[in-house]
């Protein structure tokens, strides 16, 4: 199993996850650089040690800090690469929250279902956005804004779709998930599958 370090987000930031000291999942909204860097350093990692940034989807609160890591490759699902490259503030939800520019248009790697990142497999989970993904290693689910602790799911009014979300949660229900590492809020330990079932019951 990969080593996962939870970096809790605050204000507009998403949660971020450090994997194996060289991969960062999501980078927050880009407003708290000193905080993010301090958390990396607490775990013995310098910002320039990050070789890969994986964005779980294209919204500004998950991609806003991508430019903090100019030496890292930026990876996102191919469907969410489009609004990022186009600097589409509607598609990245920046407009909805008063952020008129995300300052992040670079995508180096277009991810697809089944791609591998360290010990994780990419699972395409549209619903919150067209190109939302989760990362799954047989025990741990880094869920982005698809699933949250307590049965929550990502909002579907900012480029999402209800039927896609329902299908994505159905897909996740087939996994024997132990721990959930969501895009916002607390993590789930030991009974992740129960939280996914609860999410489905709310849809």
Task: Name the predicted role of every residue range.
Residues 1-42, 133-149:
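Conserved beta-strand hairpin/beta-sheet module of binuclear metal-dependent hydrolase folds
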Residues 2, 72-73, 120, 178:
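A structural micro-motif
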Residues 23-25, 54, 74, 142, ...:
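Residue-level marker for buried hydrophobic side chains located in beta-strands
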Residues 29-35, 39-112:
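Active-site HxH/HxHxD metal-binding segment of metal-dependent hydrolases
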Residues 30-31, 121-124, 129-203:
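Metallo-beta-lactamase
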Residues 44-47, 119, 174:
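Alpha-helix termination/capping residues and helix-transition junctions
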Residues 100-134:
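Internal catalytic-core helix/loop-beta-alpha segment
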């Amino acid at each position: 199993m990969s080593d996962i370090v939870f970096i809790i987000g605050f204000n507009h930031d998403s949660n971020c996850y450090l994997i194996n000291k060289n991969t960062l999942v999501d980078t927050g909204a880009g407003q708290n650089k000193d905080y993010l860097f301090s958390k990396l350093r607490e775990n013995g990692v310098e910002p320039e040690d990050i070789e890969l940034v994986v964005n779980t989807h294209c919204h500004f609160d998950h991609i806003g800090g991508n430019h903090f890591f100019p030496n890292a490759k930026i990876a996102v699902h191919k469907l969410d690469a489009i609004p990022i490259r186009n600097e589409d503030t509607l598609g990245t939800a920046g407009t909805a929250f008063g952020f008129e520019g995300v300052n992040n248009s670079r995508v180096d790697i277009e991810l697809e279902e089944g791609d591998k990142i360290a010990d994780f497999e990419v699972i395409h989970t549209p619903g919150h956005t067209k190109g939302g993904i989760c990362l799954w290693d047989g025990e741990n689910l880094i869920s982005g804004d698809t699933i949250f602790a307590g049965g929550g799911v990502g909002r579907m009014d900012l480029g999402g779709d209800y039927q896609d979300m329902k299908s994505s949660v159905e897909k996740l229900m087939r996994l024997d998930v132990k721990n959930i590492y969501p895009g916002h809020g607390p993590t789930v330990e030991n009974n992740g599958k129960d939280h996914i079932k609860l999410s489905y019951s709310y849809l």
